Amino acid sequence: SGKRIENGLIEVPMGATLREIIFDIGGGMKNGKKFKAVQIGGPSGGCLITDNLDLPLDFDSLKKVGAMIGSGGLVVMDEDTCMVEVARFFMHFTQNESCGKCVPCREGTKRMLEILERIVNGNGRDGDIELLLELADTISSTALCGLGKSAAMPVVSTIKNFRSEYEAHIYDKKCPSGNCKKLITYQI
């Protein structure tokens, strides 16, 4: 799904590349927009970038770049997508799905969501990126189930691949893609 020409359900052999799926089978990006990222593996999967388009889709290759096959779903994003908002969106979903049994997942995802919401609303603080990464490490290493262990993957992968977007939100109070409403300023 996402911002490509053809969306739908396809079946490809293990080892197919993201480039084959997005551009050959999916027809490329809508409206001539530039590919920015693809989120793979369901709500707790990682976000991959152009450098990963020729990566074979298999368990080991994806694990090396901080992603997973998971449900096999792909969400394709173009240049107009705010990656901080993407991380917030998936953390919101994961936090809602937490059963609450273990503290790292229940409280850690709640705290990560609070920080991400603060950032997209223009109230990010110095140290938020490091705090997100610290919480992600704690949650992934101490949670009891697969959801908790992978909950922070979208946040970690977007920080790794789009750190400058987080920094623009926090320090410049700007959303480079122009999507975060609280960070849009108007002049007359």
Please give the residue ranges for each predicted region.
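Redox cofactor-anchoring modules in respiratory/redox and cofactor-processing assemblies
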Residues: 1-188
